[in-house]
Amino acid sequence: DGAPFWEGEDLKGRRLLLFSEQGFGDTLQFVRYAPLLQARGAEVILHCQQALVRLLATAPGISAAIPRNDPPPPHDLRAALLELPRLMETSLDSIPFADGYLPRPAVVAPPADRRLRVGIVWAGSPSHKNDSRRSCKLTEMFCLFDIPGVDLFSLQFGKAAGALGSAEQVLVRNAVSGCTDFLDTAKVVCNLDLVITVDTSVAHLAGALGIRVWVMLPHAPDWRWMLERNDSPWYRTMRLYRQANPAEGWEPVIQQIRHDLSGLADSHNAAVR
C-alpha cells in the first residue's frame, strides 16, 4: 500500500483507510473513532477481519467495511486503528463514546417477567500469548450455576466450547452454536442482561453495544485495563474483577462474582415480580 499514513492533517474531502493489525477486540475497541474522523471531513473505509465486516459495515462513521484479505479500494491516507488514540490526542478524560457506540441489532425481546439472563465466556483464543493466564476452565465457574433466578447462556467459541458437555448443558444453554460472525453474536448479547467473561473480544463487543459486562482479569492484565481500578474508562457498562494473587488462581475472583451476581439476581427478580 503506497498511501501515506495520516498524521493529523486536514481530512476534508479525503478517503481514509483504517486497518486492523491485531485481534478482534482491538478492532472493536478502536473503531469508536470513526465518527470523529468522519466529522473532520473524511470518508472512512474500514479494512478489517471477515468476521467483523457485517457488524461494522453499519457502525457510525464507517462508509464501507472491507475484509482485510481483499484488496482495499483506492484511498488518500491510511491509519492503523491502534494509532488512533495517539493521533486523536486521547486522554483518560476524553475517551469517546464510552457509553457504547455500535448500533444494537434488532432482536426479539425476551419476556419482561423473566429471570436474569447472563452470558458466560471462560476462555480466549489459545493462540494468544497470554492465554494461559487470561483464560480459566469451565469447571472453575461451576459455583455460578446454582444461583437462584439466573439463566446462564454460553457465549464460548472455539475448542474450549467442547467443555460444555451434556451434563453442563442442563444448566447452561449454548447460545452461539448457530453464530457465523460477530453480528450474529451481537444479536445474542443484546438479548442478555449481563455478560461475564475473561479478557476476550466478547468483552469489547458487549461494551461497544452498551451491555453490562463483568470482565475477569489476570494479575498482570493487558495495558488497556490499567491497574487498581474496577471500572474501565473505555466502557462505562464494564466492571473489572482482578486477580489479587496469581497463586490463588481464579477462585477468589469467581467467588466475588458469585456474591455480586446473587445480589443482582435478587434485585432483578424483585423488580419483575
Model-derived regions: residue spans:
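Catalytic machinery of carbohydrate-active enzymes
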Residues: 1-273
